[in-house]
Amino acid sequence: MSKLHIKKGDTVYVNSGEDKGKTGRVLKVLVKEGRALVEGINMVSKSTKPNAKNPQGGIVKQEAAIHISNLNLVDPKTGKPTRVGRRESSDGRTFVRYAKKSGEEIK
């Protein structure tokens, strides 16, 4: 599998599927599956038994994983979806991610 360009905490745009056009923050990246959990995206209803956290149990809405190919990173400069590139940093030791549309470095 190729390198994933999305990391936890990034703001992403959904480019296909039921939630197309929405944006959200990445909560978790599932590297082996090539999927990510995004805040408020791909919500599913899940039945839960009563427990200490939820004494009544019942139906709970929560995020389900969405495939990385359906996500684009949001450019920090323009606020629009963009592709991501990697280039050497100024010290020459590490790589940094950058937005292909604006050239802006992604923190």
Swiss-Prot record:
GO function term, MF aspect, one: rRNA binding
GO annotation (BP), single: translation
InterPro entries: KOW (IPR005824), Rib_uL2_dom2 (IPR014722), Ribosomal_uL24 (IPR003256), Ribosomal_uL24_KOW (IPR041988), Translation_prot_SH3-like_sf (IPR008991)
Region described as Disordered: 73-92
A Gene Ontology term for the protein's cellular component: ribonucleoprotein complex
SMART domains cross-referenced by the UniProt entry: KOW
Keywords: Ribonucleoprotein, Ribosomal protein, RNA-binding, rRNA-binding
Family note: Belongs to the universal ribosomal protein uL24 family.
Subunit structure: Part of the 50S ribosomal subunit.
Function: One of two assembly initiator proteins, it binds directly to the 5'-end of the 23S rRNA, where it nucleates assembly of the 50S subunit.
Name of this chain's protein: Large ribosomal subunit protein uL24
Classification of source organism: Bacteria, Pseudomonadati, Bacteroidota, Bacteroidia, Bacteroidales
Gene name in the database record: rplX
